[in-house]
Swiss-Prot record:
UniProt family annotation: Belongs to the ELO family. ELOVL6 subfamily.
PROSITE patterns named in the record: ELO (PS01188)
Family annotation (InterPro entries): ELO_CS (IPR030457), ELO_fam (IPR002076)
Purpose of the protein: Catalyzes the first and rate-limiting reaction of the four reactions that constitute the long-chain fatty acids elongation cycle. This process allows the addition of 2 carbons to the chain of long- and very long-chain fatty acids (VLCFAs) per cycle. Condensing enzyme that elongates fatty acids with 12, 14 and 16 carbons with higher activity toward C16:0 acyl-CoAs. Catalyzes the synthesis of unsaturated C16 long chain fatty acids and, to a lesser extent, C18:0 and those with low desaturation degree.
Protein name stated in the entry: Very long chain fatty acid elongase 6
Pathway info: Lipid metabolism; fatty acid biosynthesis
Amino acid sequence: MINMDISVTPNYSYIFDFENDFIHQRTRKWMLENWTWVFYYCGIYMLVIFGGQHFMQNRPRFQLRGPLIIWNTLLAMFSIMGAARTAPELIHVLRHYGLFHSVCVPSYIEQDRVCGFWTWLFVLSKLPELGDTIFIVLRKQPLIFLHWYHHITVLIYSWFSYTEYTSSARWFIVMNYCVHSVMYSYYALKAARFNPPRFISMIITSLQLAQMIIGCAINVWANGFLKTHGTSSCHISQRNINLSIAMYSSYFVLFARFFYKAYLAPGGHKSRRMAASLAAQNVVKQSSSPQQASESSKFIGAGEDQAAYLRKAKAQ
């Protein structure tokens, strides 16, 4: 028998057994007992990616087009499913209980087993998502600061917030699932050599910027609610708010900087053309023979991949 508080739970048309069997107390206990693991994961991640760059320095790049298609497709499917199972809870709470409940009451974990299960998977998914960087290293694409900084901070913050049952995290989870649904679908198509319209990449970056703005706004509301009602009514810590707003603000600055350079800078080219042109020029300058010069077309493709990656540099 399904044991959920119907008053704060949307009317799911179907609930899977693995969702109904979810017990949030067990997962929280495990996260609390193993909270130090996240720092080991981050340390190993840094060693692998920067060590991998050194390893690949004098080796030819891998194409990995097939694995990349599968990788992006799986992440897109996971994100779509996650959005479909968590967004109804947020909408239901906003409609029937208002903004305060959506920011201050963690019913999405404590009373809703469906949303609680997909919240747990969301946190766990930040570990395999580190694999994005493996493709960058093996394909010898630029590893920009935003990429690895984002991966590490999201993993640590997600783990930390889950142990606290941070109530405002329902917003962050739904937004991340939704944006990743579009983003990974787009990159799966790009990896498969389909060519979605150019404006799609601009829309994705705009969605990422909107995600950061909303994230900052939610934290401002949470801070106000916390000061007005206290921790007894608003289940979020001041430390969490401070960390979250610092994280979202830094993401916004980094994404806004890219957006300006890619789409708005006077006299600038689109990011793909810039990367392809620079790659081609670099090869021509370094080539001293016709055979070497003929390799420029391969580097142009690498430049296009670089630009595609820069647009992907994620949010979380």
